[in-house]
Amino acid sequence: MSFDINWNQLTIDDTINQSIKEFLDQQFKNISLPSFISNLAVTDFNLGEIPPEVTIRHIGDPFEEFYEDENNLGVMNEANNDSKDEHLKNHGDGINKDSGYNSQNLDDEDEDDEDDDEDDEDEEEEDEDDYDDHDLGTINEGISLLNFNENSTTPSANSFAGSAAPPLPPPLNPSRDSFHSILHPYGVNSIIGATGAGSETPTNILNQNYLSSRVLPKISVKQKQPHHDDNDIQLIVEINYKGDMHINLLVNLLVNYPSPNFISLPIKLHITDIVIHSIATIAYLKKSVFLSFLCDVDDTFPDFDSNVQTPTSTTGGNFVDYYSNDATINKERIDIVKKIKIESEIGEVENNILRNVGKVEKFLVEQLRNILRDEIAWPSWICIDMNDDDDEEEEEEESEDNDGGNSDLNDNDGKHGDGRTDETEAGE
């Protein structure tokens, strides 16, 4: 199933381009720059006129993590009014990068109810029953669209049939939560290519409770439980983008020999030909839209095995293509940006300066991928709050009503004044 995107609605107004430019500029300013560059800034951003190809792979209920985010935001607002000692963290400011998931530690110190211990035990039993109800054995394995790890084997649905829960996967890297260990053993393939009846909400696929290295903190029963609305919906989509989006950056290249900052050379960098082919989730709940990239699609580009570089020119024309599947540099579970081209404008310089330009380009490409991974790759996401528009409309309506009421009062006052004037003239 696929649908068309009215891309022109995004490009007519330059507000979105300006917002993204400011966001990227702020992110680049927050990173630590190497000694050979300074004053990095994003000068221009444009979405382009070519929309991405979007294919719907699955329709179901939103992940529970999205509801937890809304609840945590609500608890945060209450905590800010009562006390600032609550250790709550907003997911919109970025999740805990070290833990690898978006659950927050909630410190609830209310001691009003003396029977909370019994309620906690009952709640734990209900949580265990809920996990059993979402057994992954009900999800059928379909067509394998993604190839996360050639050395690992994807378990079939039959392998889970005799057990109440799937076996624990061995972590690929003990020092961090690799996304392979979350997705691959539990079959994101089954979401993408499932053909039979299965669980309508495959949230356990991304449930970190199955990881041996991590344990989700228990949410206090005093917190409000997630409220599911009948209109809530989630789409698992395949996004294939090969458009004309471009980013312009300005940076100073430093030559630190024979002394630090001996030469400062401004360089203009034009980032174009961005290629994205990934699986993402788009969830709509309570007038909020959540977007998160889950994993990359394994394409078979003929020139993906090696970096391609065109001959550089001493006149400043420097074109370099960067690909994301170089085994020596790419060990992340997701890159989002698969291919990117950078054109640099530096004028007539020596060859040793050109070599430093290559370092700058590679640094910027890696930092751009890191920003996208940290901000919009699972377990991070971006949330677009649609309630702000409703609030603005309500304020406009109230303002119009107030203006209309004042106008009526002015009209009545005018009539009353005219009457008095007539009486005065008649008396005279």
Swiss-Prot record:
It comes from Candida albicans (strain SC5314 / ATCC MYA-2876). It is found in: Mitochondrion outer membrane; Endoplasmic reticulum membrane. HAMAP family: Mdm12 (MF_03104). Component of the ER-mitochondria encounter structure (ERMES) or MDM complex, composed of MMM1, MDM10, MDM12 and MDM34. A MMM1 homodimer associates with one molecule of MDM12 on each side in a pairwise head-to-tail manner, and the SMP-LTD domains of MMM1 and MDM12 generate a continuous hydrophobic tunnel for phospholipid trafficking. One of its GO terms (biological process) is protein insertion into mitochondrial outer membrane. Its main location: mitochondrion. Residues 75-168, 387-428 are annotated as: Disordered. One of its GO terms (cellular component) is endoplasmic reticulum membrane. Transmembrane segments: none annotated. The keyword Hydrolase does not apply. The SMP-LTD domain is a barrel-like domain that can bind various types of glycerophospholipids in its interior and mediate their transfer between two adjacent bilayers. Residues 146-161 have a biased composition (Polar residues). This is Mitochondrial distribution and morphology protein 12. Residues 81-96, 412-428 have a biased composition (Basic and acidic residues). Component of the ERMES/MDM complex, which serves as a molecular tether to connect the endoplasmic reticulum (ER) and mitochondria. Components of this complex are involved in the control of mitochondrial shape and protein biogenesis, and function in nonvesicular lipid trafficking between the ER and mitochondria. MDM12 is required for the interaction of the ER-resident membrane protein MMM1 and the outer mitochondrial membrane-resident beta-barrel protein MDM10.
